[in-house]
Amino acid sequence: MARLCAFLMILVMMSYYWSACSLGCDLPHTYNLGNKRALTVLEEMRRLPPLSCLKDRKDFGFPLEKVDNQQIQKAQAILVLRDLTQQILNLFTSKDLSATWNATLLDSFCNDLHQQLNDLKACVMQEPPLTQEDSLLAVRTYFHRITVYLRKKKHSLCAWEVIRAEVWRALSSSTNLLARLSEEKE
């Protein structure tokens, strides 16, 4: 029984290895599932009705043209997605959120992001990209604007609700980018 279990574990690890290491570094299926789960949990984290924070809405200038660029190479896209995921994780693990979110949902969301980040890091190590600094700078500048906004709004519940919705849109864009890259591969 122990040998069978060990054999099955090796098969699982090899299937993960081959999916991550194949030509073009295909992200494991778990990445897409984690992304969908993160979007669902982020939606569940809503604490206020959308209309209650209209006065706090702001256009943070999500760099969609940099993230979903038709000319972006897969290796560059992986790097941009990794940075986007890392910035979201940094935002939702900051000390300034205290009791803003339900702890169980926040943990679930952050765990999904950690898993996605690990998948993306494995791909970056497999296929070092030709860095596209302007894309990375655009993502970092976007998150800097979000951080400044939160500070200016003193991390209010409405400000965090606006950010939650903004991050949901950013994650949705990353899902669209991955879908497009997958279609191009086929």
Swiss-Prot record:
GO terms for cellular component: extracellular space. Disulfide bonds join 25-123, 53-158. GO terms for molecular function: cytokine activity; cytokine receptor binding. Transmembrane segments: none annotated. One of its GO terms (biological process) is natural killer cell activation involved in immune response. Keywords: Antiviral defense, Cytokine, Disulfide bond, Glycoprotein, Secreted, Signal. PROSITE patterns: INTERFERON_A_B_D. Residues 1-24 form the signal peptide. It is found in: Secreted. Its main location: secreted. InterPro entries: 4_helix_cytokine-like_core (IPR009079), Interferon_alpha/beta/delta (IPR000471). Glycans are attached at residue 102. Belongs to the alpha/beta interferon family. Produced by macrophages, IFN-alpha have antiviral activities. Interferon stimulates the production of two enzymes: a protein kinase and an oligoadenylate synthetase. This is Interferon alpha-4. The lineage of its organism: Eukaryota, Metazoa, Chordata, Craniata, Vertebrata.
